């Protein structure tokens, strides 16, 4: 078990290479590479994306960092083709390949959300087809896909609704895909946001499918992505549930809500504190 942190918030401020230096300097052992929200001019978007990934891997090796999990872009829309003729599908495949170069064991790929006007279409059946289309790439690149619990925002009532939002739906989807290349990622905050206390969500999850986490804190009102203890979640309960599940994945933070407001000059201090929080959680697992 190691401590890792997503790279999105850091990349925006200082770029990938400096982000790696800051993460290593703060004491983290790993990164969760963020392939989402990449600007068009980013090297991962270009023709030489694999060369860029190899360069990052070399720098990570030199710094003593690893990448065990990554996050694919989530641009797929209902109706997009489930093959490389579609640019969004192709972006996921590219991310899978680059993540494998970085050393990732798994990459989070969001399920495709179904618009309300197409609500007669079964969400799980639609996404079984989507994920099965990605399965050959898992084998080609030697990487697993992690299915995450998600939400959609209902602005009419200013509330959130789960998308693959219960542990039962999440596990059923993975089982229906029918491949060992698919596992579960639980976003701690998403569980709370969609009405299930995270500790209860984890206890209802099939522990054999739980491979990774997005650890964040929030206030039950919005998807804040704060550092643990910066919101109102019950971390004693969450840690207890993870211990009882014999969770052996990483302490992986998705905390751009914590890092976004921090000036670049204060990132070393902020990351050092985050690494200390990670050590605190790890010791209790």
Q: Which residue ranges define each predicted feature?
A:
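Histidine-acidic metal/acid-base catalytic patches
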Residues: 1-4, 12-27, 61, 89, ...
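Active-site beta-loop-alpha junctions enriched in small/polar residues
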Residues: 6-10, 34-36, 72-75, 112-114, ...
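Aromatic/hydrophobic pocket-lining residues that form π-stacking "cages" and hydrophobic walls in ligand
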Residues: 19, 56, 95, 134, ...
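Short, well-structured secondary-structure segments
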Residues: 29-35, 66-70, 107-108
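Glycine-rich, proline-tolerant flexible connector loops at the mouths of alpha/beta enzymes
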Residues: 34-57
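Generic structural signal for helix capping and beta-alpha/helix-loop junctions
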Residues: 40-41, 77, 116, 154-155, ...
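Short glycine-enriched, charge-decorated loop/helix-capping segments at active-site entrances
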Residues: 44-47, 82-84, 159-161, 225-229
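Active-site acidic/histidine proton-transfer and metal-coordination neighborhood
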Residues: 59-62, 78-183, 193, 273
């Amino acid at each position: 078990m190691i401590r890792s942190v997503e790279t999105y918030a850091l990349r925006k401020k200082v770029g990938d290479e400096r982000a790696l230096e800051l993460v290593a300097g703060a004491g983290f052992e790993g990164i969760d590479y963020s392939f989402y929200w990449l600007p068009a001019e980013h090297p991962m978007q270009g023709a030489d994306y694999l060369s860029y990934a190899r360069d990052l891997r070399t720098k990570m090796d030199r710094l003593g960092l690893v990448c065990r999990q990554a996050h694919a872009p989530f641009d797929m829309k209902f109706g997009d083709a489930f093959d490389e003729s579609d640019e969004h599908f192709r972006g996921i495949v590219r991310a899978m390949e680059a993540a494998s170069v970085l050393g990732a064991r798994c990459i989070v790929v969001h399920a495709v959300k179904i618009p309300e006007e197409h609500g007669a279409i079964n969400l799980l059946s639609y996404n079984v087809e989507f994920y099965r289309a990605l399965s050959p790439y898992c084998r080609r690149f030697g990487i697993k896909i992690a299915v995450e619990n998600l939400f959609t925002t209902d602005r009419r009532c200013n509330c959130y609704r789960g998308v693959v939002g219960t542990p039962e739906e999440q596990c059923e989807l993975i089982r229906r895909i029918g491949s060992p290349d698919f596992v579960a990622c639980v976003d701690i905050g998403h569980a709370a946001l969609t009405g299930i206390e995270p500790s209860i969500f984890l206890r209802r999850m099939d522990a054999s499918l739980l491979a990774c986490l997005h650890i964040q804190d929030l206030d039950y009102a919005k998807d804040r992505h704060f550092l643990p203890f910066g919101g109102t979640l019950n971390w004693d309960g969450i840690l207890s549930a993870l211990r009882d599940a014999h969770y052996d994945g990483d302490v992986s933070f998705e905390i751009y809500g914590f890092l976004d407001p921090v000036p670049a000059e204060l990132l070393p201090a902020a990351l050092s504190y985050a690494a200390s929080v990670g050590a605190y959680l790890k010791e209790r697992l």
